[in-house]
Amino acid sequence: MAKEELLEMEGLVDEILPDSRYRITLDNGHKLIAYTAGRVKKNHIRILAGDKVSLEVSPYDLSKGRITFRHIDKKQSFAGAPYRRH
């Protein structure tokens, strides 16, 4: 399948499921299950319930998607030192 055929959508994370999967509600109200893209896993980007994310969805199966980007909430302020991995 070529990348041109994928649909780009945005949604909100409702629930975190086992095996790095998430239940997402799209902006149009449709619900689906999504997993994180390799780029997101590689960069250790944490996705929590309530986060706004961008997804790629195949036009052949609209019940599954891949999370490609987590949008940053401007209202959050990080007080103190940045998160460090040990």
From Swiss-Prot:
Q: Where in the cell is it found?
A: Cytoplasm
The segment(s) forming the S1-like domain are: 1-72
Keywords in alphabetical order, please.
Cytoplasm, Initiation factor, Protein biosynthesis, RNA-binding, rRNA-binding
Q: What is its main location?
A: cytoplasm
Q: Which Gene3D superfamilies match?
A: Nucleic acid-binding proteins
Superkingdom in the source lineage: Bacteria
Cellular component terms per the entry's GO annotation? cytosol
- One Pfam family hit: eIF-1a
InterPro entries reported in the protein's UniProt record: NA-bd_OB-fold, RNA-binding_domain_S1_IF1, TIF_IF1
Q: Name the family the entry cites.
A: Belongs to the IF-1 family.
In UniProt terms, what function does this protein have? Answer: One of the essential components for the initiation of protein synthesis. Stabilizes the binding of IF-2 and IF-3 on the 30S subunit to which N-formylmethionyl-tRNA(fMet) subsequently binds. Helps modulate mRNA selection, yielding the 30S pre-initiation complex (PIC). Upon addition of the 50S ribosomal subunit IF-1, IF-2 and IF-3 are released leaving the mature 70S translation initiation complex.
Q: Tell me, how does this one assemble?
A: Component of the 30S ribosomal translation pre-initiation complex which assembles on the 30S ribosome in the order IF-2 and IF-3, IF-1 and N-formylmethionyl-tRNA(fMet); mRNA recruitment can occur at any time during PIC assembly.
Question: What protein is this chain from?
Answer: Translation initiation factor IF-1 2
What is the scientific name of the source organism?
A: Polynucleobacter asymbioticus (strain DSM 18221 / CIP 109841 / QLW-P1DMWA-1) (Polynucleobacter necessarius subsp. asymbioticus)
Q: What is the lineage of its organism?
A: Bacteria, Pseudomonadati, Pseudomonadota, Betaproteobacteria, Burkholderiales
